[in-house]
UniProtKB/Swiss-Prot annotation:
It comes from the Bacteria. It comes from Shewanella oneidensis (strain ATCC 700550 / JCM 31522 / CIP 106686 / LMG 19005 / NCIMB 14063 / MR-1). HAMAP family: HscA. This is Chaperone protein HscA homolog. The keyword Iron does not apply. The keyword Oxidoreductase does not apply. GO terms for molecular function: ATP binding; ATP hydrolysis activity; ATP-dependent protein folding chaperone; heat shock protein binding; protein folding chaperone; unfolded protein binding. GO terms for biological process: chaperone cofactor-dependent protein refolding; iron-sulfur cluster assembly; protein refolding. Coiled coil: none annotated.
Length: 620
């Protein structure tokens, strides 16, 4: 008798229970949770019907408030109400305090220089604050779905570095939540639209959220999502629009010295004005002062657009650079996907349409599209859609490499390489008898270590004491799907190895990625020249050291005239080795090589005689 297998529409009729997994958009301003139910992907509302949760946490003597409750108290208690905590993730306290923006919070530094918020509940770090935002989302999901979650896909900005990504994972770990994967926010949006519209070709993901801007250029082809290039700004978003409006109203009302409570109140009003101007040509802003008096001012759409025009123009410039990195033109982009609440601003949509030459896609709520894409990916990763052929390829934003002799950078994984990825290269020892090797892992596009960003250092010990160049050390760079880097060095003959997982103590500064890319292009010709010089200087040092060792061991094979001739040519190389003329050094090395050919032949003959001494012809 055949057994019927019954399943919800759109779900697999597998004999096992449907596994529960969610996608979480852990946003700077708002956060959402979504899931696939009965084949339909949607964000999950709370008991009041609210889908988004303000990413705000307030600490009081009585406990911890999260979301709308905390938001209502933010103006009255700004010191203990933490907003936009995502901007603090993976950054040092020094970096935060040296920025242009001031914060009402009281900070202390942790042992490794990271920020700690001083609250009535004690010292808390950004990871713990993020966990408090995740907590109600997880509880909401388990209550709505009716069971314990098997895992979650959490989205992060494409520009998050290793420390920021690890911090996001740690926040989920504090709640006992298994992170199936960290997913770049623009890529999550591509999943949401790619599965719905079944498009093939080049697509731009324009993601302007509360705190970050990301632009990603993707190629969609037969279910494969390949990120061709990414760009953006990790400190530009709708929050900056709010701050510009706030500054404008301060100037209009001639308010020069206001406390943090009134400042927060005005910031909330600025956000309301921004949202109102999305649909109206003007709106009235108001502010109630401590003495009860009320300030009022009409703000027009034209005024608002004048304030934010430079920032919007900055996002378009990022689009232009990223298209160039991807090797495509704006005309080749089939569709532009709008992500993030700030893309509702009319000027943003107008500028994006003007640049790409077509109206952007907005059929999926730009506030929810990232969470929806994450939920689709979570449903696949947890095993509910084993038949799915979806393949996702992200890229790394900056090249990864290792320092070699002379302060040079040997790139192991190039910028915009798809991840996950593993790359390996072989290196060797520089000196005879060398038993250890120090490794310096760097990030960047320049040719010299001094111009790149240092990520980590580690040492491989236990290398057999062989002649210089005889040992073979294989160095493997592995970047997982979450963008975290592991580097392993192994000596091939013995198998001895050492490794390190790169978790920087703090992330890149706001504009460092853009600056590094611009500098690499600006100094490209100069860098190549410096690299060629350094390579010749290193080669000169290697040749001189090797020849000195050979002369110490087998110098008696030479006549006095031969030795004097070699010493003279060696002295000439020593004299030019420290110069800044690569061609002169190279020529001196070639001359020395010519004058030592006979010596090399004598050493070879002598080695053969020694090896065969006392051996019979028959035995040989």
């Amino acid at each position: 008798m055949a057994l019927l297998q019954i399943a919800e529409p759109g779900q697999s009729a597998a004999p096992h229970q449907h596994r529960l997994a969610v996608g979480i958009d852990l946003g700077t301003t708002n956060s959402l949770v979504a899931a696939v139910r009965s084949g339909v992907t949607a964000t999950l509302p709370d008991e009041n019907g609210q889908h988004s949760l303000p990413s705000i946490v307030r600490y009081t003597q009585e406990g911890i408030e999260v979301g709308y409750v905390a938001a209502m108290s933010s103006a009255q208690d700004p010191k203990n109400t933490i907003v936009s905590v995502k901007r603090f993730m993976g950054r040092s306290l020094t970096d935060i305090q040296s920025g242009e923006q001031s914060f009402p919070y009281q900070f202390e530094a942790s042992e490794n220089g990271l920020p700690l918020f001083v609250t009535p509940q004690g010292l808390v770090n950004p990871v713990q604050v993020s966990a408090e935002i995740l907590r109600p989302l997880i509880e909401r999901a388990e209550k709505t779905l009716g069971g314990e979650l098997q895992g979650a896909v959490i989205t992060v900005p494409a520009y998050f570095d290793d420390a920021q990504r690890q911090g996001t994972k740690d926040a989920a770990s504090l709640l006992g939540v298994k992170v199936l994967r960290l997913l770049n926010e623009p890529t999550a949006a591509a999943i949401a639209y790619g599965l719905d519209s079944k498009q093939e070709g080049v697509i731009a993901i324009y993601d302007l959220g509360g705190g970050t801007f990301d632009i990603s250029i993707l190629r969609l082809n037969r279910g494969v999502f390949e990120v061709l290039a990414t760009g953006g700004d990790s400190a530009l978003g709708g929050d900056d629009f709010d701050h510009l409006l706030q500054a404008h109203m301060l100037q209009v009302w001639q308010l020069t010295d206001i406390d943090s409570q009134l400042s927060r109140q005005l910031l909330i009003e600025a956000r309301r004005v921004k949202e109102a101007l999305t649909y109206a040509s003007d709106t009235e802003a108001s502010l109630t002062l401590a003495d009860g008096s009320v300030l009022k001012q009409v703000v027009t759409k034209a005024q608002f657009e004048g304030l934010i025009a430079a920032l919007v123009k900055k996002t378009i410039a990022s689009c232009r650079r990223t298209l160039r990195d991807a090797g495509v033109t704006a005309d080749e982009v089939l569709e532009t996907v709008m992500v993030g609440g700030s893309t509702r601003v009319p000027l943003v949509r107008e500028q994006v349409e003007a640049f790409f030459g077509k109206a952007p896609l907005t059929s999926i709520d730009p506030d929810r599209v990232v969470a929806i894409g994450a939920a689709i990916q979570a449903d696949i990763l947890v095993g509910n859609k084993p038949e799915s052929e979806l393949l996702l390829l992200d890229v790394i934003p900056l090249s990864l490499g290792i320092e070699t002799m002379g302060g040079l950078v040997e790139k192991v994984v190039s910028r915009n390489t798809t991840i996950p990825v593993a790359r390996a290269q072989e290196f060797t020892t520089f000196k005879d008898g060398q038993t250890a090797m120090a490794f310096h892992v760097v990030q960047g596009e320049r040719e010299l270590v001094d111009d790149c960003r240092s990520l980590a250092r580690f040492t491989l010990k236990g290398i057999p004491p062989l002649a210089a160049g005889a040992a073979h050390i294989r160095v493997t760079f592995q970047v997982d799907a979450d963008g975290l880097l592991s580097v392993t060095a192994m000596e091939k003959s013995t198998g001895v190895q050492s490794s390190i997982q790169v978790k920087p103590s703090f992330g890149l500064s706001d504009s460092e990625i853009a600056t590094m890319l611009k500098d690499s292009m600006k100094h490209a010709k100069e860098d190549i020249g410096r690299r060629m010089l350094a390579e010749q200087q290193v080669e000169a040092a290697r040749v001189l050291e090797s020849l000195n060792a050979a002369l110490s061991k087998d110098g008696d094979l030479l006549t006095s005239d031969e030795r004097q001739q070699i010493d003279t040519v060696m002295a000439e190389l020593v004299q030019v080795a420290g110069s800044d003329d690569a061609d002169t050094i190279k020529k001196a090395i070639e001359i020395l090589d010519e004058h030592t050919q006979d010596f090399a032949a004598k050493r070879m003959d002598n080695s053969i005689r020694v090896a065969f001494k006392g051996q019979s012809i028959d035995k040989i």
